[in-house]
Amino acid sequence: TIRGQKLLAKADVIIYAGSLVNPALLEVKKPECAVYNSAHMTLEEVLGVMKKAEQSGKTTVRLHTGDPSLYGAIREQMDALKKMNIAYDICPGVSAFCGTASALELEYTLPGVSQTVIISRTAGRTPVPERESIPQLARHQATMVLFLSTGHLPKLQKELIEGGYTAATPAAICYKAT
């Protein structure tokens, strides 16, 4: 977003989620900006960089992709920053599901087809409550947007069909659609 670009341009410190963030986003940074790839950092290390920057009066940007309210894993960071009395602001980007719809030129809600969008994910390292399992959600026959699920495609297909979708149901698998 334009707001995100402005924040990156004035940051003294940027901590970005390495494999998830397009490196082109970092091109607007100041030459003297310290940049950290968090892909190989623990939460404690990330927080340590933030705390040190705050103590030095520096502006830090913790760069995630998309909308951090969807599988953004920011709760722990927010809680820790509050405990350290470090003020923060959240600047959401465009969620992958919105960018994907635009890139594919499709609409998730169509009259007579679906007026509901279910956003979820398959169970992986993080479990999903049984009431939110793919077969349970598929029973609604609504449009489904599934994050973090490409590593489970055979199981996912089986569960979607078990829930009521047919093998002819349109589907798209998208990676870095925007």
Model-derived segments and spans:
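Class I S-adenosyl-L-methionine
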Residues: I2-V94, G99
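Beta-strand/loop-alpha-helix module characteristic of Rossmann-like adenine-cofactor folds
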Residues: K6, T60, A87-D89, S95-T178
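Residue-level preference for alpha-helix termini and adjacent loops
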Residues: T1, S19, A24, S69-L70, ...
